[in-house]
């Protein structure tokens, strides 16, 4: 298993002028942007392991068995997914719910305790699949993932102009918006790329800070993130913006 920093997309308002010039007519694979936690699921010599986006390990035995069965015959690989917890989860504000669950699961794993998660409530929205030692474009990676019958996010092929309309619809339904990726693009580990785009079309709101979450790792004994609440009672977790 080879650890790596994930590829990151850019917010629409951070795109360079060159990308914006052709955005409306460029075709993208468009999916719902869920508000959850990105996780890695790796297969190494037949062993299935679960990791946070910064490579802290936890475990879900029943889900591991399902994935092991699905990936029978595959080489070593990495599944990248947005993890949510609870029926109909994944809407704006749901990230805080799953974050706490993953933290507890990580602590239990380090202590050798059983998995603390109700695995029936775990939702894995798989959006990428990388076979070790390969360099395939997005379309090719999705074809490979479908061969193993992995539960992928639903995608639709549409122009950037139509994706903006679609993202507004998703925002009205309570989601963050839409994720766009150029079908022929290649995965660049550790890079923030112009061909993976976050469309977050939602109204602005005044938020009140109701608490803080402690940092971990190099941020132990520091503020890790702020808990903010809007006028409807929805809670979101955001980075503090504080430097080291």
Summary of predicted features, one role per range:
Residues 12-18, 103-110, 158-164:
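Short, motif-level signal for alpha-helix interfacial/capping segments enriched in acidic residues
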Residues 130-132, 184-185, 214-215:
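Short acidic/polar capping segments at secondary-structure boundaries
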């Amino acid at each position: 298993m080879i650890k790596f920093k994930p590829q990151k997309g850019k917010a629409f308002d951070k795109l360079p002028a060159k990308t914006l010039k052709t955005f409306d007519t460029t075709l993208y694979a468009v999916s719902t942007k869920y508000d959850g936690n990105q996780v890695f699921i790796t297969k190494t010599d037949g062993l299935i392991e679960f990791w946070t986006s910064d490579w802290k390990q936890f475990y879900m035995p029943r889900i591991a068995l399902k994935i092991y069965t699905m990936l029978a015959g595959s080489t070593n690989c990495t599944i990248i997914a947005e993890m949510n917890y609870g029926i109909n989860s994944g809407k704006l504000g749901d990230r805080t719910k799953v974050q706490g669950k993953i933290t507890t699961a990580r602590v239990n794993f380090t202590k050798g305790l059983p998995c603390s998660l109700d695995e029936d409530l775990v939702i894995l929205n798989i959006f990428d699949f990388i076979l070790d030692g390969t360099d395939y474009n997005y379309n090719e990676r999705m074809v490979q993932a479908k061969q193993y019958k992995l539960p992928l996010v639903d995608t639709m092929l549409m122009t950037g102009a139509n994706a903006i309309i679609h993202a507004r619809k998703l925002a009205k339904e309570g989601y963050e918006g839409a994720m766009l990726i150029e079908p022929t693009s290649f995965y660049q580990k550790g890079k923030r790329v112009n061909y993976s785009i976050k469309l977050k079309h939602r109204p602005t709101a005044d938020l009140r800070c109701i608490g803080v979450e402690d940092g971990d790792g190099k941020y132990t004994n520091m503020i890790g993130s702020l808990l903010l609440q809007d006028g409807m009672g929805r809670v979101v977790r955001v980075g503090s913006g504080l430097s080291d």
